[in-house]
């Protein structure tokens, strides 16, 4: 079982867009799951009108009206990133989308910068709901590291609380990965890769949620997005080790800063 206290402080990136209540409601759900303290971050002036809007939203969602609100000035994304650093936020929650073109949801600028420049965990919702829908299917992109193992434990913890149907643990293998492995004399059969991935999962011990391992092959890392859509996943989970590449996305997953196939949880 994972230690939910890893997320002692959760904050929601606040705007007064038509979907603000929905994003705040999703954040409340996550707060309840992890037993965390929830605060709000707002880039703008602390006026009576703004305070009344926050008070109304908190009241509508049965959240404490004395919840902390961290005010910042300037560029929205930069302000949110400053507040995260200043107040030691463990997990930031935000709406993901700016627009949708040809059925591909494109990340908004704030969400993109939180994912790209942030040093904490990020959870982005593509279609937040006032009454949050259960997260039935998870896809976890695995790497073989202690950080990824801890991230998978945390993922399974949330999946169990959500009474999820299945967690897919996948390993993305691109054509470039295979060519590099062959050059280094590390080529292996698909069955070997799946056995290694299965062992990675089994090493966690007792698992309360149905779990399935898959090795996904393709020309680029975008094959992961195709898989997410094929299984109709509700949450894509990506472990980003702060000790590697400063916790940034690996090259084969950089497409996530542009296109997001479903709700996304980046665990740092």
Model-derived regions, located:
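Structural beta-alpha unit
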Residues: 1-5, 45-48, 59-92, 99-100, ...
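Amphipathic coiled-coil/heptad-repeat helices and related helical stalk/stem segments
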Residues: 23, 76-77, 107, 151, ...
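Gly/Ser-rich helix-loop-strand patches that form or flank binding pockets
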Residues: 81-131, 226-268
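Conserved N-terminal glycine/acidic-rich loop preference
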Residues: 133, 150, 196
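Structured core of small recognition/catalytic domains
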Residues: 165-235, 247, 252
